[in-house]
Swiss-Prot record:
The chain crosses the membrane at residues 39-59, 66-86, 120-140, 163-183, 196-216. It is an enzyme of class 2 (transferase). This protein catalyzes the committed step to the synthesis of the acidic phospholipids. It is a multi-pass membrane protein. Signal peptide: none annotated. It comes from Mycoplasma genitalium (strain ATCC 33530 / DSM 19775 / NCTC 10195 / G37) (Mycoplasmoides genitalium). Keywords: Cell membrane, Lipid biosynthesis, Lipid metabolism, Membrane, Phospholipid biosynthesis, Phospholipid metabolism, Transferase, Transmembrane, Transmembrane helix. Belongs to the CDP-alcohol phosphatidyltransferase class-I family. One of its GO terms (cellular component) is plasma membrane. This is CDP-diacylglycerol--glycerol-3-phosphate 3-phosphatidyltransferase.
Length: 236
């Protein structure tokens, strides 16, 4: 059977070809739109969380004998941040699965992550939801490390992200999500059910673990940058 006969008997792949090519063109756009989504919701997410104490908007209801009061502003901010986390995962997963990594994604994906994560962390720390000293560790680490990466890049030295930095980000995300959803019950009788060690583990431990990974990854990155810059200078 020649290819013409095969095409006449089984025309399905031929008819599907235009659809396949169109879908291939949209692959990069889908991942990029997920990045754009995070950029656009960063500001409203930060505002809802930052104005939690000022707005004080509550939703009151009862479940049996338990009276529940929800901080709506914090809850909305937490929900928006959770959608950002999901979009970040889908963005990376689809880009790898479809081999659809774009220059736009390389530039704006890490920027979107840093803006929304650091912005929300600042808002939470100012409102007293975790210790301000941990925020200083996170911000100083990112600023110094980004400056060193830029300097190394000018010397044609590229330092790839490692698992320590990824776990730092994961712990920050976990801490933010738990803070928003758990602290939204702070004026409720149900908050007493979550008090003590369990309450601390949910709302504080992730930040301390993130601080450990921040310092650890900072040291590792410094060693890698120093070694590669030393190798680069030795070739001059």
């Amino acid at each position: 059977m020649d290819w013409k006969t095969s095409e006449m008997l089984f025309p399905f792949p031929v008819y599907m070809a235009p659809l396949t090519s169109k879908f291939a063109a949209y692959k990069k756009k889908i991942a990029n739109w997920l990045t754009v989504y995070r950029i656009f919701i960063a500001l409203p997410t930060i505002i809802f969380i930052a104005l939690d104490n000022q707005l004080g908007v509550l939703a009151n209801f009862s479940v049996g004998a338990i009276s529940i009061s929800l901080q709506i502003s914090l809850l909305i901010g937490g929900f928006l941040f959770l959608t950002a986390v999901i979009s970040d995962y889908l963005d990376g997963y689809l880009a790898r699965k479809w081999l659809a990594v774009s220059n736009f994604g390389k530039l704006w994906d890490p920027i979107a992550d840093k803006v929304i994560i650091n912005g929300v962390l600042i808002a939470l720390a100012i409102n007293g939801y975790f210790h301000f000293s941990l925020l200083i560790v996170f911000i100083v680490r990112d600023l110094v490390l980004d400056g060193m990466r830029i300097y190394a890049y000018e010397k044609k030295v590229v330092i790839a992200a490692n698992w320590l930095g990824k776990w730092k980000t994961i712990m920050q995300m976990v801490g933010i999500v738990f803070s928003c959803f758990v602290w939204s019950f702070k004026q409720s009788e149900i908050a007493s059910l979550n008090s003590g060690l369990f309450f601390w583990l949910l709302t504080q431990l992730p930040y301390y673990l993130a601080a450990v990974f921040s310092i650890w990854s900072f040291i590792v990155y410094n060693i890698q940058i120093y070694q590669q810059l030393k190798a680069y200078n030795s070739k001059l």
